[in-house]
Structures are given as C-alpha cells and as structure tokens.
C-alpha cells in the first residue's frame, strides 16, 4: 500500500495525531507567514507502504503529550496584533488561508480554542514544541507499530494531485483488507460538516470477536496513569469525529466535487508516471485525478464495510513501553454534532474565539501562550474589577 512521507513536502493535515495528548501537526496552510500556491508543481518523494502478510499500512503521524513549556518571550507579544484575532472582514478560514480543517486542530480547539488560534499565529513556537523529547518518543512508538505490518517504498510525486492520489490509493488498498477481516492502520477519512471540509487519519480499524468494527486510537503518555477527565473529553471527541467521517464515507455522503472545490485540486490533472505505476500494481486503473477520486468513492460506498460499532482509546506508557489501559469511548451523535457545530462557528466567522472557563484556568499554567493570551488578560481584568466592586460594598 502507498503512504505519504514528508520528505521535501509540507506537513499535511491528513497526517493527524494519533498517539499523544493535545498537540497538532501544522496543516498544509501551517503558517500565515509563508504559503504555498494553491495550485502548483511539487517535486519530491512520497512513499509506498507494502504491507506484510497480516495487515495493512499507514501514514506517519506525530504525537501529542504536552506538559509545561517554556514561556513565550515578551518580544513575541509585540508581533501579535489585536487585529490578528479580531479582524472581521474575513472569516478565520479565509484569514488563515485554510481550505480544510484537520481533526487534530479541532481537538486542540476542544482543549482550548485560544491556544489553537495562537498555534496558527505563532507557527514557529508550535514547531519548537513538536521537537520535545516526549513528542519524539511518541512518534517512535507509533512508527514501530506501523513497521510491524508494512514496508515503505518511495514514490515520485510531481503535483499536489499526485500527493493526494497516494493517500487515496492507500484507502483503496486497505478497504479489501478490512473487508477480509484484517487489521488496518492509518486509514484516511474526510467529509464536509457544516460546509467545512474536515480531514483525519484513523489510527487502527479491526473486527473484534463479536464481529463489530472497532476503531482503536493509540495515545502515549509520560505518566503511567490514565488521563484527566479534561483530556479524556478531548480524546472521546476525536474518535467520535473519526466515526462521523468514516460512516459518512461508507454511506456515500461524500461527492467528488467536495474534494475538488474545497481543496482546490485539479480534477483533470494527469497523474504522474510513478503514481500511475503504483496504482496499476494495486489493480487500479486511473489516468487523471478525477478518475481516481471516482474509483475511491464508488469503492468505499459500495463496499461491505459497516459503520464503526465501537470506539476505544488505548493508553501506552512511554517509560515502561507497556500498556496503561484501554478506554471504551461513548458515542452520542447529537452531542458530537452539536459540539462540532459550535467549534466550526468560529472558523466560519460567526463568533470570536474563546478561551477556557474559569473552572479550567489550570490549563493556562502549561500553555505556551500564557503571557500573551488576550482571553486570559481580559478574564483577570474582569475578576479584578468584580473583586474591587465587591470590596467597595463591604
């Protein structure tokens, strides 16, 4: 099966986080300071993951564990203009030049919306955070699991369409494996919710002894204990959103024009020779990007795959390299959709960003942006005014 490496390529929001706490990978529009053309040539190498006999293949994902970080220097405050947060002429999707949102970014928003916004305003700080030891260990653990079931072979890509084609070919390779009862890893999912295109990558799909289709999400932790209820809420939202996207694909809700229009991809683009060759090896005959998209959508919607039956989160201790425990996540579709609608209302420009409530102000102590956060400063100002008002009436 084919898989996308990041060698000489921008970090991609398809490569969603799967094994840490609440960090996100910068998406294809990771920085508002430096942007790639919406449509252009991209030369480099992607990679093909050729599965070993027992299973499927995967995308390389990064990890999340996020303890207290070095505070942002005061010099960074000067670079953050008020209009960056409160400019109303364009929606945040437009201001940050986002064609889509990743599940990872929405999970960051679940933890703290202001932090997710500052991550986009200050991408250099985010990149530094991703180099921490805990994140690197999480990556290594996750990669070792991938390499248990797949080999990696490079594939030459020339355009953005080639890069996306590699990911679609991954899906086409994994679908029959999953239908046959095999375990697959790093399964891409996508869909349109509230008019916004959302992408993610499911860590693992498999059938249990009851015949239920199970989504398993790996999370590595520094602490040899299960996470707090606040972090558990983020993780449950993540797997719930994956289920919404996966179920939508198998139900045939995704249309090809959603992909072309939202991601600004050229439907008539001829696939590169390397991509066509690997597609042929998989028994897929597609000359253009549109032909490949059509093949994928027909295959997944007409497959024998059911909707996901069970969501579980597997916690793994970095220090001992052993399991901590597995949590079965509840799924309430109405609740997930309601939360998602609220989060997306910020990105579509219907409201201003919000920080944490006073009951969760403890999150600020481990936040990179504690010293520059406008929400936090305003909350302190309001609290001081309320305290002064109360004192004056004593």
Swiss-Prot record:
GO molecular function, one term: 4 iron, 4 sulfur cluster binding
One annotated Gene Ontology cellular component of this protein: cytosol
Keyword tags: 4Fe-4S, Cytoplasm, DNA damage, DNA repair, DNA-binding, Exonuclease, Hydrolase, Iron, Iron-sulfur, Magnesium, Metal-binding, Nuclease, Nucleus
Basic and acidic residues biased stretches: 61-79
Needed co-factor(s): [4Fe-4S] cluster; Mg(2+)
Cofactor note text: Binds 1 [4Fe-4S] cluster.
GO BP of this protein: interstrand cross-link repair
Location within or outside the cell: Nucleus; Cytoplasm, Cytosol
Chief location of this protein within or outside the cell: nucleus
One matching Pfam family: Exo5
EC number, UniProt record: 3.1.-.-
Disordered as annotated region, ranges: 42-79
Binding site for [4Fe-4S] cluster: 112, 364, 367, 373
EC category: hydrolase
PANTHER family with a match to the protein in the record: EXONUCLEASE V (PTHR14464:SF4)
Task performed by this protein: Single-stranded DNA (ssDNA) bidirectional exonuclease involved in DNA repair. Probably involved in DNA repair following ultraviolet (UV) irradiation and interstrand cross-links (ICLs) damage. Has both 5'-3' and 3'-5' exonuclease activities with a strong preference for 5'-ends.
Subunit structure: Monomer.
Homology family: Belongs to the EXO5 family.
Protein name as annotated: Exonuclease V
Taxonomic source organism: Danio rerio
Upper classification of the organism: Eukaryota, Metazoa, Chordata, Craniata, Vertebrata
Gene designation: exo5
């Amino acid at each position: 099966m084919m898989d996308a490496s990041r060698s000489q390529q921008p970090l991609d929001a398809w490569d969603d986080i799967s094994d840490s706490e609440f960090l996100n990978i910068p998406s294809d529009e990771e920085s508002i300071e430096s942007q790639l053309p919406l449509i252009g040539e991209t030369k480099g190498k992607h990679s093909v993951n050729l599965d070993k006999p027992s299973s499927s293949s995967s995308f390389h994902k990064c990890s999340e564990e996020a303890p207290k970080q070095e505070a942002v220097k005061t010099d960074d405050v000067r670079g953050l203009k008020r209009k960056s947060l409160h400019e109303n002429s364009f929606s945040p999707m437009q201001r940050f030049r986002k064609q889509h949102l990743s599940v990872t970014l929405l999970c960051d928003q679940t933890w703290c919306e202001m932090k997710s916004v500052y991550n986009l305003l200050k991408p250099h700080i985010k990149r530094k955070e991703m180099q921490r030891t805990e994140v690197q260990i999480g990556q290594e653990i996750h990669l070792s699991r991938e390499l248990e079931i797949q080999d990696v072979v490079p594939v030459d890509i020339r355009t953005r369409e080639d890069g996306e084609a590699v990911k679609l070919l991954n899906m086409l390779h994994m679908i029959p494996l999953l239908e046959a009862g095999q375990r697959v890893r790093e399964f891409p999912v996508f869909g349109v919710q509230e008019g916004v295109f959302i992408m993610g990558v499911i860590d693992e799909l498999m059938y249990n002894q009851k015949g239920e289709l199970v989504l398993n999400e790996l999370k590595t932790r520094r602490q040899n204990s299960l996470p707090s209820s606040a972090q558990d809420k983020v993780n449950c939202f993540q797997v719930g959103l994956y289920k919404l996207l996966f179920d939508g694909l198998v139900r045939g809700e995704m249309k090809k024009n959603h992909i072309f229009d939202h991601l600004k991809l050229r439907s008539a683009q001829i696939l590169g020779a390397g991509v066509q060759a690997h597609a042929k090896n998989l028994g897929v005959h597609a000359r253009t990007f549109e032909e490949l998209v059509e093949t994928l959508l027909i295959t997944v919607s007409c497959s024998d795959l059911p909707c996901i039956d069970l969501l579980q989160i597997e916690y793994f201790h970095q220090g001992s390299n052993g399991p901590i425990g597995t949590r079965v996540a509840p799924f309430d579709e109405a609740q997930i959709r309601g939360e998602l609608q609220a989060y997306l209302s910020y990105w579509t420009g219907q409201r201003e960003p919000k920080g944490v409530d006073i009951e969760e102000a403890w999150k600020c102590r481990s936040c990179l942006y504690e010293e520059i956060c406008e929400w936090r400063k305003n909350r302190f100002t309001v609290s001081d005014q309320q305290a002064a008002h109360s004192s004056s009436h004593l």
